[in-house]
Structure formats: structure tokens, C-alpha cells
């Protein structure tokens, strides 16, 4: 009996698994330079950063292949290259860009609108997750990979703000009842120039009282002091010293004391 042997042919399956694997590989192989971990007492390095880092380092760094994805939520999508093949087998080089849209999405945690570029796929995922906050804060490793540098920074801001809301700085501050039945919260209990002071306002309010007084003092000697420089000067100053400084400027501390 004669057997008929058909030639072996490879058929291409209609699947995106190979494409997705290639995109994840482009993310996972990215690396960032190892940053030195400075400790108190270490020798002063030759290069000192000009300012403190505002965000933690993103594990997968920035993309050098599709750089515009570093400034939006692209979900790990990259530009794809290939060929258009005509009936005469002529190949024409072509590239396919992700479907990018610019949207303004409301963040409940940050209480503001976030305007950012994203792919249509990411926008659909955000709708499924129930908002951009849920999308950014999901703990899955795949979500961290697809966030990118910009998404990582937004995630840090959302998580930081959530922690501030859940754990305010004066959450356990004592509340006392005054003579007229009015209640007041004691933010600080300090001794200023030998006198005990129970302060009823927070640090931000104290800084707002001190800034115009410091600005006048700078102006008296022919110098200028803007608010940014003022915040840098007093960012790490203890509250006790801020109160002492206010008293040096003849500020009446009794107006903020109970």
C-alpha cells in the first residue's frame, strides 16, 4: 500500500504570548546604578547630591528603548517593528506605536485631577480596578513592572498621602477643656526661655507666623528671603527653637498658648 507523506509545515498560532514575553523581558533586564548608602560618621564623599531624593528608586529604572513611556502609564507597551508584505512579496518596513491617549483622572487620595498620557489598555484596566488610586497601589509584581518611572512616583505620592490621612502627626494630641467650655488641642508642650508653654497650633502655623518676621529682618540688612529658602533653613529646626525665635522677634506667644 502506497503511503502519502505530506510535507511538514510550521503554522503560526494567533497568540500574543511571545510578544508579551518580549515586552516583559525588556523591563526585567533594565538595571539602575547602585546608590551608595551613607551612614552617620562616614567619610565625606567626593560628590555630594545637591538635594535630598524625593522618591525611592524604581527597581527597573528608565527605558532606553521607548523613552516616551517613561513619562506616562504605558503598561509595559513598546513600539513594535515589522514588515508589510505585498502580494508580490515586497517588504516595506513599518512600526506600530501603542494607542496612546491623554486623560485627566480624579484621585480621591490626592484630591486632585491627574493629567497623564496612557495607553487605551491601561485606561481600560484603571476602569476595571475602580480608579487610578487602586491601579497605582496594587501590590502584584506585574503591576509594579508596568507602572514605569512616572507611575512609580505617583504610587509613592498616593501611598504617602494615605499614610498621612490614616496617621496624622498629632493624632494622639491631648485635648483640654478651657474655662468657657471650649476645647483646645495641645500640639506641643515645650519650655521656652524657662517658661512652660502649651501650644495650640501646629508647626505649619508657627512657620507662617515666623516667615514675615524673618523676612523683615533680612530686608533690614539689605538681603532678600523667599519662602522656599525660608523652608530650607527651618526644615529641621525643632519646634522649641522656632518658638524661641518667635519670642526673640517680640511675638506674643500667649495668643497661641492655653
UniProtKB/Swiss-Prot annotation:
GO terms for cellular component: mitochondrial inner membrane; mitochondrial large ribosomal subunit; mitochondrion. Belongs to the bacterial ribosomal protein bL28 family. Component of the mitochondrial ribosome (mitoribosome), a dedicated translation machinery responsible for the synthesis of mitochondrial genome-encoded proteins, including at least some of the essential transmembrane subunits of the mitochondrial respiratory chain. The mitoribosomes are attached to the mitochondrial inner membrane and translation products are cotranslationally integrated into the membrane. This is Large ribosomal subunit protein bL28m. Its main location: mitochondrion. Component of the mitochondrial large ribosomal subunit (mt-LSU). Mature yeast 74S mitochondrial ribosomes consist of a small (37S) and a large (54S) subunit. The 37S small subunit contains a 15S ribosomal RNA (15S mt-rRNA) and 34 different proteins. The 54S large subunit contains a 21S rRNA (21S mt-rRNA) and 46 different proteins. GO terms for molecular function: structural constituent of ribosome.
